[in-house]
Amino acid sequence: MAYNRINTLSTITATDQPQDTTWWREWYTLRWGRYYGTYKPGKYLLPCDDVECDRLDIMHKFFLVTRQHEMPNFGGLHSYPLPDQPKILDLGCGTGIWAIEMADRHGGRGRVEGWDLNMTQPESIPPNVSFHRRDYEDPWRDVEPNSFDIIHMRLLNGSVENWPRLYSQVFRHLKPGSGYLEQVEIDWRPQSDGDPRPLAESKLMEWSQKVHRGFARSGKKLEMDPNTKGILEDIGFTVEHKKIIIALNPWPELESKKEMARWFNLGLNQGLEAMTFQSVIHWLGYPEPEVRELIERVKEDMCKREWRTYCTMHVFLARRPLSPGRRA
């Protein structure tokens, strides 16, 4: 079943602003031609307009394709079996596409919640799905502990200030013995499977370094913490960690890898502005024209097959054991 997204804004330039701006100023602010949410300003660095929503849906398709090739369980949506009427929570749910597909997959049984700072989800949704404007780093005082079968996170790097605290809240609200956290992230630092010198001197590498510096300066690091598995284990989880190599363009020989690369290239291409404007213009102070020129050069570098460039996707499957955790 299709669910139309109808309550987001199309990207417009400053000269195209509507005459009556009161309707959108309560929810959005316009910067560099992109709309950003006004709830807890600065908490989330990416925009929330239609271009960004399309990008998130493209990335959802990328994740499904990748996991169907690399981890072919449950249509690529999740990894472990769930009960017949599962209780599901999606943190940073974005457009709500994962939550809605999870509800459809379970035939309307169980309950699915999605939390996000920005309400960019459809108004027409399955009856067992609900979306809430909420900061998942705030205390979960009104949420029943020991209640969720799965808590899902995807692409949250760059929006979390305190990972151990968030993981501890997740731990306390999963069902002991069966509930699990499923977290999917991308390490956005490009690497080369060939001669590393062209990539090291490229605009793509310059972009990555600047974006990571900007996110770090904002207090929300974009890079994958190499000790994530250890942090989860210290809290009490039993953890599986899988790494998947994702080419930036279809240079691999395997057709499955080529398909993954095409979707990844499309998603990253559409997301360059979103990842760059706040982090590099606002937090590092670079002028907008210079940043836009950098983005155009990055798009060229992303398509150079001879560089054999790739990023790494991380999947963490963290189950809460029946016995109490050590810290959470």
Residue ranges of model-derived segments:
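Short N-terminal helix/helix-N-cap motif within the alpha/beta-hydrolase-1
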Residues: V160-N162
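Conserved catalytic/acceptor-binding region of the Class I
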Residues: G158, Y180-G271
